[in-house]
């Protein structure tokens, strides 16, 4: 397992590079969309997703399950009181079946797993981007990037997140205030551990060959 210093170095490199989460796939660098590829999820028309005024997912705490083929199911709590745009976007994409059959394309043991890219390489996203709900982008967000946190990948553009997300295996405080954390795993974190421990990666950026990428069977909104 990599040390925290290594993870931090990768994260900073991704942020500067093109995303950790794009960091090859995340959507942003650190998890920049995690890697150099931060995906820069810019909708086709360049517009940002805005929840409807009566959107039930834009307030309160919601719950969803993330089922990964061959690994099991994670249960997550999503806090729209902190990140209403992010939670609304995620829940609606899940309800549409957007995530079903997509993969985790970037995996860094001791750091995080990143997925939700229809291209499977950190460069794709949904039709629209969302505003980055984190402090360096002018939005208060007190959810820390600790073990089990779910957060959005992005590119260097603070408003470039779209569909790619990452789940923390270990704490990475340097991501706080720079990425839109919007919930946490409440059950099944061992799924993340199993993925990190068993999936072979191609490089230090956590790139996973297409044939080895864990498949998201379904993301289902519970309430």
Task: Label the model's feature ranges.
Residues 2-223:
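Cyclophilin-like peptidyl-prolyl cis-trans isomerases
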